[in-house]
Regions:
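Flexible, acidic/Gly-rich N-terminal and inter-domain linker regions that tether
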Residues: 1-100
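Flexible, glycine/proline-enriched loop segments at strand-loop-helix junctions
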Residues: 38-39, 125-131, 158-159, 189
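Conserved, mostly hydrophobic/aromatic
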Residues: 54, 117, 274
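Short, charged beta->alpha transition segments
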Residues: 92-95, 104-108, 138-145
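Canonical Radical SAM [4Fe-4S] cluster-binding loop centered on the CxxxCxxC motif
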Residues: 99-134, 186
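Mobile, glycine- and charge-enriched loop segments
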Residues: 119-120, 148, 229-254, 339, ...
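Conserved AdoMet/S-adenosylmethionine-binding subsite of the radical SAM
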Residues: 138-145, 149-150, 161-306
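C-terminal accessory regions of radical SAM enzymes
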Residues: 299-371
Length: 371
C-alpha cells in the first residue's frame, strides 16, 4: 500500500518575507570586517532577524531604521540595566502571563516577531523556542478563566499577529467565552514591521471579537509607508480602534520636530498616538536611553503646536514591576490666594480660579501681571 502524501498548504505571501529574513551579518551590505565580527559576537547572545520589507526601509548605514534592526556591539559591552526590567517573571503566576495590575493581565501568545528590535525590553526571551508553547498558552487561559478579577487581557509576545489566523481565532474564541473578560487588546508591531500580514481575511476575523483594541508601534516617520497605511486602514475599517506606543530612542527619534511629524502621520493613517515611552532599562539597550528632560522637552514642544489628538502621554514603566506612570511637563507655577498660577505652551503665565464655581465670586481666568 502506498502511503498517502502529506500535502503542505501553500504559504501566504507574507510568510515568504519571514522565510527570506536575514539572520547573519554576511547578508548585510557595506559592513567592515570589524562590524561583521562585532555583530557575530552580539547575535550569539541576542539574535538578529530582519525581514526584507523592513530591511528595505533602511536608506543608509546608521540611519534610524538601521539602528533599530541591526545589532550593535554596545548591546554586550555595556551592561547597565536589568535582564527583566519590568519584573515580568516575578509577577508571573504561570509561565507566559504577567499579572501586575488587579484587573488585567499580559498574556504572551507568540514567540515570533517579524524583526527583532534591538531595544526590546524582552531581549532575554527573543528568539528562544521556549518563549511560548501550547502548554504555556493552555495554562494562561486556565489562569484567566479561574481568576474572576481579570476583565482586560493584553495579548503580546513576540507578536500575536504572527500566529496563523486559525491559531489566533482559537485563542480569541477561548477568551471571548470567559464571561468576566470584557476587553481584549493586542500589542503588535506588524502594521509597521510587516504590514503585508494584515489581510482582509485577518481583519474580518478580528472584527468578530469586539470590543477589541490594537496598539501598534511606530517609532519614526519613515516607517509610515503606503503599505503600513493600507494595513492600518484594513484594521480601522474592521472597527478596531488603533493606538500607537512609541519608544523614545537616542539616535532614532529623540527630536521634537521628528516626533511631531510622526504623530501627524499617525493621525493621517487613523492611528491615535497613545503613549510615548521612556525606553525601558533593559540590559543591552543603554545606548538607546535618553535623559528624562529630553522627553519632557519634546512633550512641551508638542503642547500647543499639534492637536490634542496627536499628543501621546509620556510614560515611564517603572523597574521591578512598579507599573506605568505618566510624566508631564510642569505647567503649574504655584498658588496665589484663590488662584492657580500656570504657564501655557508659550511660557506665558496665567491665573485660574481654584474656588468652587458655586462661590459666585466672579473669578475669571486671566493672564498674570508678572512673569
Amino acid at each position: 500500500m502506498i502511503p498517502a502524501l502529506k500535502i503542505r498548504q501553500p504559504i501566504e505571501p507574507w510568510e515568504k518575507f519571514l522565510t527570506d529574513s536575514i539572520t547573519t551579518p554576511e547578508e548585510l551590505s557595506l559592513l567592515t570586517e570589524t562590524e561583521e565580527s562585532d555583530i557575530h559576537k552580539v547575535i550569539s547572545e541576542y539574535p538578529m532577524f530582519i525581514n526584507p520589507y523592513f530591511l528595505g526601509l533602511i536608506k543608509e548605514k546608521g540611519d534610524a531604521i538601521y539602528r533599530q534592526a541591526v545589532p550593535d556591539i554596545r548591546e554586550i559591552s555595556k551592561l547597565e540595566g536589568f535582564v527583566d526590567p519590568l519584573n515580568e517573571e516575578g509577577l508571573s503566576p504561570v509561565q507566559g502571563l504577567t499579572h501586575k495590575y488587579p484587573d488585567r493581565v499580559l498574556f504572551l501568545v507568540s514567540g515570533r516577531c517579524a524583526m527583532y528590535c534591538r531595544f526590546c525590553n524582552r531581549k532575554r526571551k527573543v528568539g528562544r523556542a521556549s518563549m511560548v508553547t501550547r502548554e504555556t498558552i493552555r495554562e494562561g487561559l486556565s489562569y484567566i478563566k479561574s481568576t474572576k478579577d481579570i476583565r482586560d487581557v493584553l495579548l503580546s509576545g513576540g507578536d500575536p499577529l504572527l500566529l496563523s489566523d486559525k491559531e489566533l481565532f482559537k485563542i480569541l474564541s477561548e477568551l471571548r467565552s470567559i464571561s468576566h473578560v470584557e476587553t481584549i487588546r493586542i500589542g503588535t508591531r506588524i502594521p509597521c514591521s510587516l504590514p503585508h500580514r494584515v489581510t482582509k481575511q485577518l481583519a474580518g476575523m478580528l472584527k468578530g471579537f469586539h470590543p477589541l483594541y490594537i496598539n501598534t508601534h511606530f517609532n519614526h516617520p519613515a516607517e509610515i509607508t503606503p503599505q503600513a497605511a493600507s494595513a492600518c486602514s484594513l484594521l480601522a475599517e474592521a472597527g478596531i480602534p488603533l493606538g500607537c506606543q512609541t519608544v523614545l530612542l537616542k539616535g532614532v527619534n529623540d527630536d521634537g520636530m521628528l516626533i511631531k511629524e510622526l504623530m501627524l502621520k499617525l493621525l493621517a493613517i487613523r492611528v491615535r498616538p497613545y503613549y510615548l515611552f521612556q525606553a525601558d532599562l533593559a540590559r543591552g539597550t543603554s545606548h538607546f536611553w535618553t535623559a528624562l528632560k529630553k522627553g519632557l522637552g519634546i512633550m512641551a514642544e508638542l503642547q500647543g503646536n499639534i492637536s490634542g489628538l496627536g499628543i501621546p502621554r509620556f510614560m515611564i514603566d517603572l523597574p521591578e514591576g512598579g507599573g506605568k506612570i505618566p510624566i508631564t511637563p510642569e505647567y503649574i507655577r504655584g498658588i496665589k490666594g484663590d488662584e492657580l498660577v500656570v504657564k501655557n505652551y508659550l511660557g506665558d503665565e496665567y491665573r485660574y480660579p481654584i474656588i468652587d464655581h458655586g462661590d459666585q465670586k466672579g473669578y475669571t481666568g486671566h493672564k498674570a501681571e508678572y512673569k
